[in-house]
Amino acid sequence: MKTALMLIAHGSRNAAANDDLYALAEELHHARVYAAVEASFLELAEPTIDAAVRRCLLQNAERVILLPYFLSAGVHVRRDLQDHRDRLAQEYATVEFILA
């Protein structure tokens, strides 16, 4: 089963603040552990979660691990990301979405 890893951060209007996530995604991509590695942001930056999922699916991912990249497990991690996972699972019923 082709598994993709999708890193999800909050996002910032300050583009430089988002660079760490892009760098981590690039390093993980080069490790070739996953069929695809994508960075995504909950808000304020691109790509969005939906856009990153589409990129994973274009690379034929059958499973997508949604990995939160947050300092603490606040409302976004405990509630919002679970809501995204549930919606994606309904929209793409043939793909397994795992919220790590």
Where does each model-flagged region fall?
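Active-site-proximal alpha-helix that buttresses catalytic centers in soluble enzyme cores
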Residues: 1-100
